[in-house]
């Protein structure tokens, strides 16, 4: 699911592959910027055909699932689907940022910048993090879609 995360800024598809490494702490340095390298490990490289990012009840503020606070979760009821894990996380980040703006009435930066998304694009070449290059197609309701 898309949610804020203490070490990586947000958790999404890129971060989910951390379960395939024996030493997850090795990937938590520098705001989790090495996460994209996991996608090049033989165990997982080229095996993901479709990325699904749940945005059913996103967490938009806080340290992540271990510090859950119901005030910062909302019923978005969305599902993002993409062949590109970087693009899907970019759009998940945009959703979180839009909700934070709506809730706080101003831009409030995440405690940890989600730099792993751009690094996954620029360094590890996993996809695109530039929202201008992402085709975002919305199906269904548009009320309160935020992005």
State the predicted function of each range.
Residues 1-147:
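Extended, low-polarity segments enriched in aliphatic/aromatic residues
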């Amino acid at each position: 699911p898309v949610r804020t995360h203490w070490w990586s800024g947000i958790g999404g598809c890129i971060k989910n592959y951390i379960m395939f490494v024996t030493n997850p702490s090795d990937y938590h340095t520098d705001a989790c910027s090495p996460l994209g390298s996991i996608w090049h490990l033989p165990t997982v490289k080229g095996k993901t055909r479709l990325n699904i990012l749940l945005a059913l009840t996103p967490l938009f503020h806080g340290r992540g699932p271990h510090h859950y606070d119901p005030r910062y979760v909302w019923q978005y009821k969305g599902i993002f689907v993409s062949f590109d894990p970087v693009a899907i996380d970019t759009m998940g980040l945009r959703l979180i940022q839009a909700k934070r703006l709506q809730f706080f009435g101003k831009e409030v930066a995440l405690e940890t910048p989600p730099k792993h998304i751009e690094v996954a694009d620029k360094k590890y070449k996993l996809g695109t993090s530039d929202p201008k290059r992402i085709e975002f197609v919305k199906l269904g309701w548009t009320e309160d879609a935020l992005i």
